């Protein structure tokens, strides 16, 4: 490691697993991971009544698409409910460059929270890899958290397991923000 702030994917995986190296799957369809920011799965994202009960004003679909591993919703799906929508056509593979969407997702979450009663659901198919990665990036970029703090904050409130490619992208974001003096180490 060339600098004290650089972390490895293994460092982050250690935070995600229990002492035996096991990972837990989400026990709830949706969890509030930080105030007014929820991470959830496809079932809650497609349940307008449940979203309204939660007071969700914005939905960020990190798995937009028609294939099995995606969630086929769009702005028109939410149109009659008054929910603002953003879709990202992300694949849950180690090779997918989700970091290309960190800024756009962060801006959308900011937009939701700028409203007095704004609440945002960030979801993917399972609410386990893509969507928590985007929320972790948001916490790093806007709350000035380092990657371990951001990941731990989300993990305390929801079982998550971003794939190793996404964890590597979060490590790269951490390095960049640290070099720019934009995270608290």
From Swiss-Prot:
Transmembrane segments: none annotated. It catalyses: O-phospho-L-tyrosyl-[protein] + H2O = L-tyrosyl-[protein] + phosphate; O-phospho-L-seryl-[protein] + H2O = L-seryl-[protein] + phosphate; O-phospho-L-threonyl-[protein] + H2O = L-threonyl-[protein] + phosphate. This is Dual specificity protein phosphatase 3. Belongs to the protein-tyrosine phosphatase family. Non-receptor class dual specificity subfamily. Its EC number is 3.1.3.16, 3.1.3.48. The keyword Transcription regulation does not apply. It is found in: Nucleus; Cytoplasm, Cytoskeleton, Flagellum axoneme. Residues 28-179 form the Tyrosine-protein phosphatase domain. GO terms for biological process: cellular response to epidermal growth factor stimulus; flagellated sperm motility; negative regulation of epidermal growth factor receptor signaling pathway; regulation of focal adhesion assembly. It comes from Mus musculus (Mouse). It comes from the Eukaryota. The active site is at 124 (phosphocysteine intermediate). InterPro entries: Atypical_DUSP_subfamA (IPR020405), Dual-sp_phosphatase_cat-dom (IPR000340), Prot-tyrosine_phosphatase-like (IPR029021), Tyr_Pase_AS (IPR016130), Tyr_Pase_dom (IPR000387), TYR_PHOSPHATASE_DUAL_dom (IPR020422). One of its GO terms (cellular component) is axonemal microtubule doublet inner sheath. Microtubule inner protein component of sperm flagellar doublet microtubules. Interacts with VRK3; this interaction activates DUSP3 phosphatase activity.
């Amino acid at each position: 490691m060339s600098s004290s702030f650089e972390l490895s994917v293994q460092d982050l995986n250690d935070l995600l697993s229990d002492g035996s190296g096991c990972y837990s799957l989400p026990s709830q369809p949706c969890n509030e991971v930080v105030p007014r920011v929820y991470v959830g799965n496809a079932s809650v994202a497609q349940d307008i009544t449940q979203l309204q009960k939660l007071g969700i004003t914005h939905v960020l679909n990190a798995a937009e698409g028609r294939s099995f591993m995606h969630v086929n919703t769009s702005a028109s799906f939410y149109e009659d409910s008054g929910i603002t929508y953003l879709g990202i056509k992300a694949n849950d593979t180690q090779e997918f460059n989700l970091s290309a969407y960190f800024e756009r997702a962060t801006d959308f979450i900011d937009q939701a929270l700028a409203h007095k009663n704004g609440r945002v659901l960030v979801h993917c198919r399972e609410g386990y890899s893509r969507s928590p990665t985007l929320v972790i990036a948001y916490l790093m970029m806007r709350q000035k958290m380092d990657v371990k703090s951001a990941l731990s904050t989300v993990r305390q409130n929801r079982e998550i397991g971003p794939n190793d490619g996404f964890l590597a992208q979060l490590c790269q974001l951490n390095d960049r923000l640290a070099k720019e003096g934009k995270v608290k180490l």
